[in-house]
């Protein structure tokens, strides 16, 4: 027997609808009806989180001190390596459990975990090559978030096939061992393929990885830092996205994560191929990466929490819009001709692009996963704008993932114990 939900408004693929009844069966939306009164809350489709490194949740607030030299992404990376070398499998599960709980409480209902912390601290493989991935899957199962595992191929420390550095020893794989890792991840649930970057995979390896992915999601970091752009130019004579578009079969199943430093021609090329721009505005601001040129991009985009320094879907959207306002010296930059309400345009765009990047159905529609979020409000555009631009705390009330309620009145049932276990882990690690 289908379960039914009635809302005063719901954000459907075609826009807002009033007095909406959803029928849910076996984790999917069986029917969407309008004109059914009696609902009180506003329903939003669950937000996909298209880029996360769950273990980095343990770094939040611990890299905000200036060192003796100029601080940058690259100095932050050295601190991240120290954490990565200390993490044990149980620590990965603890960090991921808290991160996934916080994602759900903020309205993320699915996450693409860009996972590269594969091996033991000395670089040897665990008996189960997917031990760390299995911990991520366990955390997702226990919290209820929908997980796309993206095991990362990381074989080199720089362009031209440079050998990995000693502190990167937990990340490395050959194509053969990576294929075994992918097979293990596929047994754990939905999975894709993730070359770390053009620095970490040669063209021959990237070609093999694209073949391995087939039509599954393929995600790659690209053009996050100007130093990467300069190194790619020195190596190939081309910019990173330009190089990818010329040498790889970039298509709709590709997500180009960050793509911060791109030209209008590269932006047009990404859009023409159907690649999703994976934007992580809070992390990109935290690391001083730069600002994605959204005004030059006509393609799909989604949002990710990346380093998990602050996990909040609405604040990612806020940072995205405000960064564009600062760059363009205009207001309401991400609004569109068809959706002039900025928060609604941001939300709808990120849901659509994020769902494509994760290879899942997105939106409140028949056949889609029954993953949705409720907020309070009478006028839905204003309610969503307040949640994105004016809320001091998340305005999410309840969250369902595949028909299961995982957040009630803004709180996940595991929130308290997840935080206590996380704090105890930090006391050991830091």
Regions found by a protein language model. Give the residues of each.
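Active-site microenvironment of metallo-dependent hydrolases
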Residues: 1-20, 25, 344-430
